[in-house]
């Protein structure tokens, strides 16, 4: 402290004590680096409460794609200015850059989009960092598919007309979106709908940001030829998805969306007609024979 010399030795000297100003600093740093994103320098009297909150700056950083790791100011047990003018108080707030995850785009029809696999690093730029778990991957909600199943059946039944010549056909249109995750554990922060890698809709959102991974339409599917059967004329078109003459299932007329229902379509077949050869009287009758199929025409 300061030494006071009395003006009149032997008499009481009045000494007025004044609290000095103290300084404190709150730094926002990126985890695992020396990068300081922001610094607030504060000043106040010794012993006075530090009038400050990290909420505003953390909200700004979140909007810029950062997630809180530790808040050394809010969790501090003593948030008053100290009494040591020689040493400034330092509080550290640590944040981490969020990671956008976009599924792969299928290269072949009916191939599924792919997310990372369990054991892969959550942040590809930090291969030695935290790894994906199956539990975290299952919660990403960034891949959906609309399926179309075509079954070729005998008219009036649910029996397949020929599992070998006319096997059941299933195809799909897949949709993906970019999920933004916390690099520490892969938990969902939100979804990126603008393409900048930053979450702009909440983690609870189920409808935003979806895009078709390839074509958004089901392609035309010609009905197969089945020996002894022809497609039934005047088919149920099932919402104009099946050609009335049964020759094909139509191409989608409009783009599908992630909310489009799955399609379960039936193409019906009937037996071909028969003919009975006429033989001279007294000859052994010949059993009726089915008309032969046109190998290029299911009808």
Question: Can you say where each PLM-predicted feature lies in the sequence?
Answer:
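Conserved "repeat-terminator" motif of extracellular CCP/Sushi domains
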Residues: 3-29, 79-147, 152, 243-281
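Local beta-strand/beta-hairpin segments that build beta-sheet-rich folds
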Residues: 35-43, 159-169
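Acidic carboxylate motifs that coordinate Ca2+ or other divalent cations, activating on Asp/Glu
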Residues: 196
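Surface-exposed interfaces of beta-sheet-rich extracellular modules
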Residues: 1-3, 52-86, 208-253
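Solvent-exposed, conformationally flexible loop/turn segments
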Residues: 7-10, 44-53, 84-88, 114, ...
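Terminal, regulation- and interaction-focused segments at domain boundaries
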Residues: 39-42, 51, 202, 207-209
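Calcium-binding motifs, dominated by EF-hand helix-loop-helix domains
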Residues: 189-191
